[in-house]
A protein has these predicted regions:
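Ligand-binding pocket segment of bilobal, Venus flytrap-like solute-binding proteins
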Residues: 73-74, 152-240
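C-terminal lobe and pocket-closing loops
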Residues: 212-285
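Alpha-to-beta junction loops
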Residues: 56-58, 76-90, 147-149, 197-207, ...
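Solvent-exposed loop/turn segments at secondary-structure junctions
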Residues: 37-38, 89-93, 119, 129-130, ...
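Hinge/capping helix and adjacent helix->loop/strand transition within the periplasmic-binding protein
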Residues: 27-30, 50-59, 77-81, 96-192, ...
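Ligand-binding clamshell of periplasmic/extracellular solute-binding protein-like
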Residues: 44, 48, 64-71, 81-95, ...
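An extracytoplasmic/periplasmic, membrane-proximal ligand-sensing/linker region
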Residues: 272-325
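Short, low-complexity disordered leader/linker segments with a strong preference
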Residues: 1-30, 325
């Protein structure tokens, strides 16, 4: 009798253990190429991950490891679906600018779906600057040949691309002499660029449109700022024209740039896993709660399946490479 009871208890324990194992969520590590938890890289990846985990039944967490480690992790992962990356244009720009080797090129990883965009890139100046737009800044330089405008950008980044587009347009539209009156100043993170502006060490900075709103219209002349050019259309932004609206072009076409956030996998990712993420990402981007959460952060969902996303990001890389060269 005791033996029978013991056997029954053993069978029950094994069943419970099996059930618990069957119901255990898959652990997924989402790495990003930033070490910050306050910027768009983390905020977008975290929001996408929460909703994607719900659709996929994951236990997932964003790990802000920084660009160098992110590349290594994705490159060396076994492709079983327990590690993915979500990151913006620096995924290819790091290689284009020569910061990282060709072994980290898009051809050596797998492009997943596009899941989000940040359209908020802009250039800002102090409120009392003698120009209100980037075109007016070029006109100011033309009228004042001894003047210069110092523009703070981060080396090898989206800000560098946006500056190059403006510089090349000034060169084509106003000539070498006016273009030479523009000086790019290497700067670090956003807070550093703002301090450089307030200290009078630069005249224009690359920033985030929503980030500078706290300084627009303030009484403190030392801190007061204004937007002089948006890189893309932003709903409700009426205080500054976009590059396109100002007539700033590249290769004869209006220039616009948003940060595009895509999912990336190791090269040997399981095909069924990638297909499932595509389907889940499509549902996430249609989810009204997700749209609302993204809007609160001033970002937006922007779904493309893996195939379309690959074509999109490869074409964008080609265009940005032409701009750099």
């Amino acid at each position: 009798m005791k033996r029978r009871v013991l056997c029954m208890l053993l069978v029950l324990a094994m069943a419970v253990t099996c059930l618990a194992g069957c119901n255990r969520k898959k652990s997924v590590r989402v790495v990003i190429g930033s070490s910050s938890t306050s910027g768009d890289s983390y905020l977008i990846a975290d929001t996408v991950t929460r909703y994607l985990a719900e659709e996929m039944g994951w236990d997932a967490k964003v790990d802000p490891v920084g660009a160098a480690e992110m590349f290594e992790i994705i490159r060396n992962d076994k492709g079983k679906g327990d590690t993915i990356a979500i990151f913006h244009d620096m995924m290819y720009l790091g290689v284009v600018f020569g910061t990282y080797g060709e072994e980290y090129a898009l051809e050596n990883i797998t492009v997943g779906p596009r899941v989000a965009q940040n359209p908020g890139c802009c250039f800002a100046a102090k409120a009392d600057a003698p120009y209100n737009t980037l075109v007016e800044a070029a006109e100011y330089l033309k009228a004042n040949p001894d003047a210069e405008i110092r523009v703070a950008c981060e080396n090898g980044s989206v800000s560098t691309l946006c500056y190059l587009a403006y510089y090349n347009w000034v060169l084509d539209s106003y000539g070498q002499e006016v273009a030479d009156q523009l000086r790019v100043i290497a700067a670090g993170v956003t807070s550093e660029k703002r301090q450089m502006l307030w200290d009078g060490n630069v005249d224009i900075i690359f920033d985030d449109y929503y980030g500078i709103q706290q300084y627009v219209g303030v009484d403190d002349k030392q801190l007061a700022m204004k937007c002089v050019g948006l890189l893309d259309e932003i709903e409700g932004a009426v205080d500054a024209p976009t590059y396109a609206e100002q007539g700033i072009t590249f290769n004869g076409e209006p220039f616009a740039l948003s940060k595009d956030f895509l999912v990336y996998y190791p090269q040997n990712i399981d095909a069924d896993f990638a297909k499932a993420v595509d389907a889940a990402a499509a549902k996430v981007c249609e989810n009204e709660s997700f749209k609302s959460d993204m809007a609160k952060l001033n970002y937006r969902g922007a779904y493309l399946d893996s195939s379309a996303a690959k074509d999109f990001i490869y074409n964008k890389r080609t265009e940005m490479t032409q701009l750099i060269e």
